[in-house]
Amino acid sequence: MFEQRVNSDVLTVATVNSQDQVTQKPLRDSVKQALKNYFAQLNGQDVNDLYELVLAEVEQPLLDMVMQYTRGNQTRAAQMMGINRGTLRKKLKKYGMN
């Protein structure tokens, strides 16, 4: 089970193990581990558009959760994310979330 929490200005991922012990680590550590796993599975294959792949993996759930948090209020969501509302609308359309 994973849960995201804001701890100061750092997003963390809380993991609950089988003994109900909770451990927290920065989200960036989880991203780094996911990339290590991805590279290990490549077996020397070339990769194209890695930046877009990683960005899409993070951006889509970010948009989804922010839109849920703001109850669909795009102006408030854009403000929360620090982006222009037009940019938000473009990103929502890109992921079929409009």
UniProtKB/Swiss-Prot annotation:
InterPro entries: Fis_DNA-bd (IPR005412), Homeodomain-like_sf (IPR009057), HTH_Fis (IPR002197), Trans_regulatory_Fis (IPR050207). Keywords: Activator, DNA-binding, Transcription, Transcription regulation. It comes from the Bacteria. Gene3D superfamilies: Homeodomain-like. GO terms for molecular function: DNA-binding transcription factor activity; sequence-specific DNA binding. Residues 74-93 bind DNA. Disulfide bonds: none annotated. It holds the Pfam family HTH_8. Belongs to the transcriptional regulatory Fis family. NCBIfam families: PRK00430.1 (NF001659). Activates ribosomal RNA transcription. Plays a direct role in upstream activation of rRNA promoters. Homodimer. This is DNA-binding protein Fis.
